[in-house]
A protein has these predicted regions:
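An amphipathic alpha-helix signature
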Residues: 2-3, 25-29, 111-119, 126, ...
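ATP-dependent small-molecule kinase phosphotransfer cores
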Residues: 12-81
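Residue-level signature of catalytic and energy-coupling elements of molecular machines
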Residues: 60, 86, 150
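Small-molecule kinase domains that catalyze NTP-dependent phosphoryl transfer to phosphate-bearing small molecules
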Residues: 71-72, 80, 99-100, 120-171, ...
Length: 177
């Protein structure tokens, strides 16, 4: 949001899929009938499925990720005339969604700060967080692939200033190359 350009937020899209997509529900219910009981899909049911068997995260991902990917393609198509779009996708690299000309920005945050934010969530579950972390690439790999790094350990105002500077840098580099 701070970039003030169209933003595709994968986490928000996943939530929308759970809330709106009956086909996703039917597939999950068929594959995980012991856990998925009602539509819209409840996060508590997903958490229970992953808690009981770590392999269930792969089943869930195999159903949800293609739907989110289609939504991302639609978003990119709708915003193709925009100077810039922001893809806020935590598993961008893991799902091989980055393209050659993309400019990757690694957002670094202190572990304690991340944990503090996660604990504020309604369905906070440390076991699930550990399972999700195992599905992610190592932070060092992500940092190496990124052209820029921003520290997210500051106030919103400081972040706005940092993002403004980063935007200017990106536009300058794009216009001079």
């Amino acid at each position: 949001k701070l970039f003030k350009y169209p933003v595709f937020n994968a986490d928000q899209e996943v939530n929308n899929v759970y809330r709106e997509n009956k086909n996703c529900f039917n597939q999950l219910k068929r594959r995980l009938p012991k856990f998925i009981k009602s539509f819209p899909i409840k996060k508590s049911e997903l958490i229970e499925a992953v808690s009981s068997n770590r392999k269930n995260i792969k089943i869930i991902s195999s159903i949800v990720h293609p739907i989110v990917r289609k939504r991302m393609v639609k978003f990119l198509s709708q915003n193709r005339n925009s100077q810039m779009v922001v893809l806020d996708i935590p598993l961008l690299i893991e799902n091989k969604l980055n393209k050659k000309g993309d400019i990757l920005v690694f957002v670094r945050s202190k572990k304690a700060k991340i944990l503090k934010r996660l604990k504020k969530r309604k369905n906070y579950n440390l076991k699930i967080i550990e399972v999700l972390k195992q599905n992610q690439s190592k932070l060092l790999k992500k940092r190496k692939l990124a052209k820029y790094t921003i520290d997210n350990n500051y106030s919103a105002n400081i972040m706005k200033k940092k993002i403004k500077i980063l935007k200017e840098k990106i536009f300058y580099e794009r216009s001079s190359s």
